[in-house]
Every structure is written in C-alpha cells, then in structure tokens.
Amino acid sequence: MSNTGITLALSKGRIFDETLPLLAAAGITPAESPESSRKLIIGTNRDDVRLIIVRASDVPTYVQYGAADLGIAGKDVLNEHGGRGLYQPLDLQIAKCRMMVAVREGYDYAGTVKQGARIRVATKYVNAARDHFASKGVHIDLIKLYGSMELAPLVGLSDVIVDLVSTGGTLKANGLAAVEHICDISSRLVVNQAALKLKRSVIQPVVDAFAAAVAR
C-alpha cells in the first residue's frame, strides 16, 4: 500500500458481516467475501483501500505495528492487547455481547466470594478477569484457555469461567449459568496513531463516514 492508500484489518464472521454497512457508508465495497475466498488480502472498489483478513485477536497487533492503518476489534480483544499505539475514535456499536462470570448450576458463587475462598477461574480474557476480581478483593488462580470454556467447570478444571455471552443458550445447554456481569462488549474502530498523522486526508473521511453511519 502506498503512502496515500490505507489498509483495514478485519476478522471473518460476525464482525465482518456487521461492518459491511459501515464500509458501504464510506463508499467501500469489498471485491470478494472472505467467507468464499481464501485470499487474506482483498481489494475494494477503491484503489486506495484494501482489506486484510486476520484473526480477531491479532487485529490490534497489525494496527499497532503499522501493517494495517485501521482495524475493527472487540473491546474484549482490545482489553487483552492493552491498546498500545492505538487511537480508538469510535465505538461502532456492532457485535454486541456481555462479558460475564459463569458457574455450573448448584455452585454457590456468592457464598464462596463472601467466605473469601480462593477461586479458580478459566478464561481467555485473563486481563479482564484479573482486574475484575481484584476490584472485588477476590483471590483467584487463573487458567488460560482458548476455547470450549464451558467444559472447564464441568470437569473440575475451574470453579468459574469468564466468557462472552450473547443469548446464554450455550451456557444453559451445558448446565451453566451467568452469575455476574463484568462489562458490555462491542466492536471499536482502531487507528494506528502514526498513520493518522501521515494519511489523515484518506483516513479521516473513513472515520467520519463510520461515525455518521453509527449515529443514524
């Protein structure tokens, strides 16, 4: 990408699908769908804009190091990354869900916390979990997992989990229940701070178009 062109980092799935109307508002149409193409670099109807398809958890890193000028990432991912080198101008209000503490049915979470007992927590959101329980004065042992979080309490790996919840259907199907709300999650637009200075004439109109679309 030239000094006048921009690269936008996106992940497949729900975030990409819900970003399409925002891209359209900015006059950007992907040449292909990442769901049907194996390409990781996708052109658009604009010669000065291209998309790169990366793992959701990697979006902030690509933007931080300048491999992408902009990206769209969930608040959960940004919390774990730390936000270094990133400007976060806009909450896009897409891919909404909640970060929750969940337990197996029958586990006395409130009683355990009240007694001051140490709790074993399984999650991939270790920073968010650590901060949440520290704010409550609860001592925990953290176990980092990358998937199938619901299994951990069922097989005795953990007492509780911290995970994202949309409808709660997956928790219920596995005999778990959400017991505590940590924070609301949605996706944010992130911009490389250096790129914003160097390419403001190209980046700012995209940011403004996204903002206008969100405000509608």
UniProtKB/Swiss-Prot annotation:
Disulfide bonds: none
Annotated catalysed reactions: 1-(5-phospho-beta-D-ribosyl)-ATP + diphosphate = 5-phospho-alpha-D-ribose 1-diphosphate + ATP
Subcellular location: Cytoplasm
Cellular component GO terms held in the UniProt record: cytoplasm
EC number(s) recorded for this UniProt protein: 2.4.2.17
GO molecular function, one term: ATP binding
Enzyme class per UniProt: transferase
Pfam families to which the protein is assigned, alphabetical: HisG
Broad class of the protein's primary localization: cytoplasm
Pathway the protein acts in: Amino-acid biosynthesis; L-histidine biosynthesis; L-histidine from 5-phospho-alpha-D-ribose 1-diphosphate: step 1/9
Keywords attached to this entry: Amino-acid biosynthesis, ATP-binding, Cytoplasm, Glycosyltransferase, Histidine biosynthesis, Nucleotide-binding, Transferase
Family: Belongs to the ATP phosphoribosyltransferase family. Short subfamily.
Role of this protein: Catalyzes the condensation of ATP and 5-phosphoribose 1-diphosphate to form N'-(5'-phosphoribosyl)-ATP (PR-ATP). Has a crucial role in the pathway because the rate of histidine biosynthesis seems to be controlled primarily by regulation of HisG enzymatic activity.
Domain notes: Lacks the C-terminal regulatory region which is replaced by HisZ.
Subunit structure: Heteromultimer composed of HisG and HisZ subunits.
The protein's name: ATP phosphoribosyltransferase
High-level lineage: Bacteria, Pseudomonadati, Pseudomonadota, Betaproteobacteria, Nitrosomonadales
